[in-house]
Amino acid sequence: MSNIQTGYLNAQDAAALDVELMSTPGFSLEQLMELAGLSVAEAVYEVAFGGDGEKASNDGGRKKRVLLVCGPGNNGGDGLVAARHLAHFGLESTIVYPKQSSKQHFVNLVKQCEDMGIPILQEIPSTNDSSKVEETKYDVIVDAIFGFSFHGTAPREPYATAISQMVQLQKEQSVLLSVDVPSGWDVDGGDLTGTNFHPDVLISLTAPKLSAKKFEGRHFVGGRFLPPSIAEKYGIQKPPYPGVSQVMEL
């Protein structure tokens, strides 16, 4: 881990910053979700091809396979956007989206993924069928279930089961990457409920949340779009993003 300092946001400031982005500089929710999803996709690509050791190593020249588990809110929307970008990047995306939102923007995101030929499932495929081992083998699992609005209670179904299944896939050598906050973690306090959910990689969006101090894996940040005035107001130090990248590893 580097010594790069970015500042941390508590849950209250993270919510306030989101609101301010959609008022003072006039970002739309759709813009922010697109920028966030692109950042997630870049981090996944870096993990799949550049880096988490043997877990994401090349396997006989086949396409890298990514399973994105999406929740009902904006974090899930980030996952949908990421799935589309990953497909454009040449990876094989599969989406698990148990509770699809009826909001038009989310409906549009689903349609865009369908147009890319991305499968959208209701639940994570079972790994118990030995004849389908290759079909359920993923290089990277993306946890895009809950974001910074989650507060410290045990996740409910169907997400509790999904989280357990992601942990199992992680044990079977998939790299587990969480979007913004590991699902089930309190935004400020971390894993307060003892979920035993510990991703290999975290991609913090806009800026790391307080719970990221409890995270011990690879840590990326994606917040290159943040206006300097807002960054200063919330005590965020933007890292020196390389080249044209939207993400940087801390």
UniProtKB/Swiss-Prot annotation:
Residues 14-238 form the YjeF N-terminal domain. One of its GO terms (molecular function) is nucleotide binding. Its EC number is 5.1.99.6. Binds 1 potassium ion per subunit. Pfam families: YjeF_N. NCBIfam families: yjeF_nterm (TIGR00197). Belongs to the NnrE/AIBP family. This is NAD(P)H-hydrate epimerase. It comes from Thalassiosira pseudonana. The lineage of its organism: Eukaryota, Sar, Stramenopiles, Ochrophyta, Bacillariophyta.
